[in-house]
């Protein structure tokens, strides 16, 4: 039994207000679907934040419709929860994922907290804020009890856990029951795999670089999704890396070496087929307007 664990695509995100960056998030999602079809998993688990917002742009909605239709044609069902970005924080409302039930998506919700596929228990909860953590813990406890009737079980959540995000979390690691074989988590954008209870706990991470603080983890572990094999006593978790649409560069330079370093960066960028994202920090005593103008003059004419 093999499945894909993917999360945090943030489709519709127009980073820096650039349509090129919005396209990058769409393109990498397309590549993810291609790779999933190649892997031929038994099902897909999506751990939230498929979209950047609860009211995604039409293009994002159509892209997901086309992608999930392809997975349905390949007999690959999808089990999904909404995350904090694509959850509508009002009663009696529906997340955008509900549009795709006719395309093979099974929405894990308060109404349908778990499903069973080929003897595997798949249970979870949509994102719940820390202000309602008591309700979240009660749901998790309920799912833990129900899962004990099955040989294999998966818990799907879109929450931060204190062990992995100590300054901003909704759950403590001790709040999780230890009876699941795989904990398919979303919300934290860095890739994480850990031993927990009788199985493995994993954040599959985002599929694109949403913030600069993800760059270090990306360079070390890549971005993409996990391919999980449940057949052994302990799940085997393999990362499938996706190619990014453009390079992300983070540079810190001294103002005293400004001209030399900008020239070096310009030559490096000119060799690229696609314009990168450049995060640049200039250190020293300088006039900000001068540096800004110099950067525009030096780098804006690269083609």
Give a label for each model feature:
Residues 43, 54-69, 73-213, 221-222, ...:
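His/Asp/Glu-rich metal-coordinating catalytic cores
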Residues 1-67, 145-146:
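N-terminal active-site segment of His-dependent metallophosphoesterases
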Residues 232-303:
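Accessory, non-catalytic peripheral segments of nucleic-acid enzymes
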Residues 47, 186, 281-283:
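Conserved residues at the C-terminal ends of beta-strands
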Residues 30-40, 141-142, 258-272:
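A short, well-ordered alpha-helical element
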Residues 1-23, 222-245:
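Domain-start "cap" segments at the beginnings of catalytic or binding domains
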Residues 209-211, 218-221, 298-303:
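Gly/Ser/Thr-rich active-site loops/lids in small-molecule metabolic enzymes
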Residues 5, 46, 80, 155, ...:
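Structural beta-sheet core signal
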């Amino acid at each position: 039994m093999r499945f894909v664990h993917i999360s945090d695509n943030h489709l519709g995100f127009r980073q820096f207000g650039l349509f090129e960056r919005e396209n990058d998030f769409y393109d990498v999602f397309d590549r993810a679907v291609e790779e999933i079809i190649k892997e031929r998993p038994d099902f897909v688990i999506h751990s939230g934040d498929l979209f950047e917002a609860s009211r995604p742009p039409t293009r994002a909605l159509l892209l997901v419709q086309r992608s999930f239709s392809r997975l349905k044609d390949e007999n690959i069902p999808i089990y999904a929860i909404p995350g904090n970005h694509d959850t509508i924080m009002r009663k009696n409302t529906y997340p955008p994922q509900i549009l795709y039930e006719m395309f093979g998506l099974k929405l894990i919700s308060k109404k349908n907290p778990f499903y069973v596929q080929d003897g595997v228990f798949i249970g979870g909860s949509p994102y719940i804020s820390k202000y309602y953590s008591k309700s979240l813990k009660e749901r998790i406890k309920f799912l833990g009890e129900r899962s004990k009737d099955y040989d294999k079980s998966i818990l799907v959540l879109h929450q931060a856990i204190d062990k992995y995000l100590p300054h901003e979390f909704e759950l403590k690691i001790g709040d999780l029951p230890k009876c699941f074989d795989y904990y398919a988590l979303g919300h934290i954008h860095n890739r994480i795999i850990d031993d927990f209870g009788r199985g493995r706990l994993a954040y599959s991470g985002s599929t694109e670089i949403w913030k600069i603080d993800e760059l270090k983890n990306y360079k070390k572990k890549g971005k993409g999704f996990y391919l999980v094999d449940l057949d052994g006593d302990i799940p085997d978790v393999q990362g499938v890396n996706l190619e990014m649409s453009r390079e992300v560069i983070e540079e810190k330079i001294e103002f005293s070496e400004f001209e030399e370093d900008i020239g070096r960066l310009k030559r490096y960028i000119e060799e690229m087929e696609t314009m990168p994202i450049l995060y640049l920090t200039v250190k020293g005593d300088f006039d900000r307007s001068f540096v800004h103008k110099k950067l525009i003059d030096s780098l804006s004419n690269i083609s």
